[in-house]
């Protein structure tokens, strides 16, 4: 999710969507030799606002790290992110049960009172809870443009754009729930004014990790994990997840391949054809050579910053909705 700072995460370039390619770049966001990053004003606080809005704990001490990998849209060969000390952790989002199909609501045939760990996930008989493992700060990369012909192009205007990455626990069990989660997060983060939240502009993007639990002959099987990258609409999330579930089930029935904790398939979504396509297979323990970002020292998150972030969150939207319903009899 891209944040609404005036400048990019670690330089003074304007943080704005669009424009002529490669016109809002500088030596810092391109990673040129000798260029030194600095944390832009408001970046950490906006990350804390998002974390508090999503019911997270805010770290008192954190740092930035370098994640090394090669890809054409990553000009400097590494991405500034947070590895082992994320800014936010242990949050949750409550999804209204009324938005689920009737058979998944209280008393329905597919009603799920607990998550995969057996913990209660139904709150006040009104909400289904999805836990958030962590929210970390990182910079965006450039944008690849695949036009007709033999060539692809890179627009580096987007590189260095301030992001938060929201990582959930594996609590969602259907494509509808995944799409509803994304809609709810968009609604919350727009409400606290940390992002525009326009999926069509890339302000929010979704990577969906999917595998199946298959009961057969009294035994539980787990299919290999697939990660569908860069889903940019609620329909794409729902349709891609629906197709991938069907593809995995068919593949399991044909070759009985089971979950391998060290293996993951990266998929893309071909919206025109309505299918997922393999982009690459990889060891999920791939070595990104994480190291502490040497040009940005670790820092303490002050009580004043957290207090200021809490004031910007104000009364959360769910609580305000409940209060309006009780005080004014709204439905």
Model-flagged regions — what are they?
Residues 1-315, 320-322, 326-328:
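Basic, nucleic-acid-interacting segments
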């Amino acid at each position: 999710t891209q944040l609404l700072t005036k400048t990019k995460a670690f330089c003074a370039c304007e943080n704005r969507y669009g424009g002529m390619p490669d016109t809002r770049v500088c030596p810092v966001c391109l990673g040129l030799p000798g260029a030194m990053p600095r944390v832009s004003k408001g970046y950490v606080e906006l990350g804390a606002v998002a974390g508090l809005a999503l019911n997270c704990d805010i770290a008192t001490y954190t740092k930035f790290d370098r994640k090394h990998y090669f890809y054409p849209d990553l000009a400097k060969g590494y991405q500034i992110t947070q590895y082992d000390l994320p800014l936010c952790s242990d949050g949750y989002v409550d999804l209204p049960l009324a938005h689920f199909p009737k058979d998944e609501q209280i008393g329905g045939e597919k009603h799920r009172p607990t998550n995969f760990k057996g913990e209660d996930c139904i709150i006040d008989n009104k909400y289904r809870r999805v836990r958030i493992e962590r929210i970390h700060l990182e910079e965006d990369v450039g944008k690849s443009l695949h036009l007709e012909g033999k060539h692809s192009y890179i627009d580096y205007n987007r590189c260095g754009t301030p992001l938060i990455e929201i990582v959930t626990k594996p609590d969602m069990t259907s494509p509808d729930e995944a799409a509803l989660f994304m809609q709810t997060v968009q609604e919350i983060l727009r409400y606290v004014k940390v992002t525009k939240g326009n999926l069509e502009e890339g302000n929010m993007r979704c990577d969906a990790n999917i595998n199946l639990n298959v009961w057969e002959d009294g035994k539980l099987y787990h299919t290999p994990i697939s990660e569908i990258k860069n889903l940019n609409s609620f329909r794409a999330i729902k349709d891609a997840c629906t197709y991938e579930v069907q593809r995995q089930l068919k593949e399991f029935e044909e070759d009985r391949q089971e979950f391998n904790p060290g293996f993951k398939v990266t998929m893309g979504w071909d919206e025109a054809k309505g299918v997922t396509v393999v982009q690459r297979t990889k060891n999920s323990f791939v070595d990104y050579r994480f190291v502490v970002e040497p040009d940005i020292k670790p820092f303490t998150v002050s009580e004043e910053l957290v207090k200021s972030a809490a004031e910007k969150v104000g009364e959360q939207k769910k609580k305000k909705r409940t209060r309006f319903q009780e005080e004014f009899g709204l439905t």
